[in-house]
């Protein structure tokens, strides 16, 4: 892979194509070691998840100590007003105009609300935010978000926390083909390193992981596995895989074979 093969997010060049979440780990120490082992340069955080000032201070100090770029999110928001308010709070607290916009429309499968997402995206972009919207694998929705000014899109692979992988690789592939200039990050639903590898093989620019690492038997080892998988997937994409065929083709030359083997 060339040394200048960077992930680009709103003009910033990032070496790692793995973004990592900061929730659900069995302990702060495991979270810290897992983040380091992943090689990630961007960590997502939720302002809502800190229950007490003391716990919040400890958490932020751990995150700051990693030296990674923070991508705050609006996890848990169900309305446009709620998401806008939280996004503005995040901008003040974290001193960044990046926001991972999450607006849930269904509590059963945590599917994003496409209508509220479009409305909130426009408001935030008009207010100077650089929005990274968490969305479904719907082509038209992704096109609309891109047209509003989202340079980065984050379609799901499957519902959050399911670990099912890429349920609709056709849709994801279509989005990649139709939006060649957008930075595309598969967010949610990945469970195995092979899922992340597949996303990169499809031409996606990165993956965002949380449950797949935090919920593993050994999160630190799983972080290393995902790091290797993402690198392998990007290598494979850049190498341009052989075309798939419906008919077998021998890999061994037939020249020099006995004539009775060529009948």
From Swiss-Prot:
**From its record, what is one biological process in GO terms?**
thiamine diphosphate biosynthetic process
SUPFAM superfamilies (UniProt xref)? ThiG-like
Q: Does the keyword Cytoplasm apply?
A: yes
**Which EC numbers does the record give?**
2.8.1.10
Catalysed reaction(s) here are: [ThiS sulfur-carrier protein]-C-terminal-Gly-aminoethanethioate + 2-iminoacetate + 1-deoxy-D-xylulose 5-phosphate = [ThiS sulfur-carrier protein]-C-terminal Gly-Gly + 2-[(2R,5Z)-2-carboxy-4-methylthiazol-5(2H)-ylidene]ethyl phosphate + 2 H2O + H(+)
Chief site of localization: cytoplasm
> Which residues hold 1-deoxy-D-xylulose 5-phosphate?
161, 188-189, 210-211
Q: Which Pfam families match?
A: ThiG
Q: Where in the cell is it found?
A: Cytoplasm
From what superkingdom does this record's organism come?
Bacteria
Query: Which keywords accompany this UniProt record?
Result: Cytoplasm, Schiff base, Thiamine biosynthesis, Transferase
Pathway in which this enzyme or protein is active:
Cofactor biosynthesis; thiamine diphosphate biosynthesis
List the Gene Ontology MF annotations in alphabetical order.
thiazole synthase activity
Enzyme class comes to transferase
Q: Record's InterPro entries?
A: Aldolase_TIM, Thiazole_synthase_ThiG, ThiG
Q: Which GO terms describe its cellular component?
A: cytoplasm
Q: Which residues form the active site?
A: 100
Q: Which CDD domains match?
A: ThiG
Which PANTHER family does UniProt cross-reference here? THIAZOLE SYNTHASE
General function of this protein: Catalyzes the rearrangement of 1-deoxy-D-xylulose 5-phosphate (DXP) to produce the thiazole phosphate moiety of thiamine. Sulfur is provided by the thiocarboxylate moiety of the carrier protein ThiS. In vitro, sulfur can be provided by H(2)S.
Family in the record: Belongs to the ThiG family.
Oligomeric state and interaction partners are given as: Homotetramer. Forms heterodimers with either ThiH or ThiS.
Family annotation (HAMAP family): ThiG
Q: What is this protein called?
A: Thiazole synthase
- Which organism is this entry from? Pseudoalteromonas translucida (strain TAC 125)
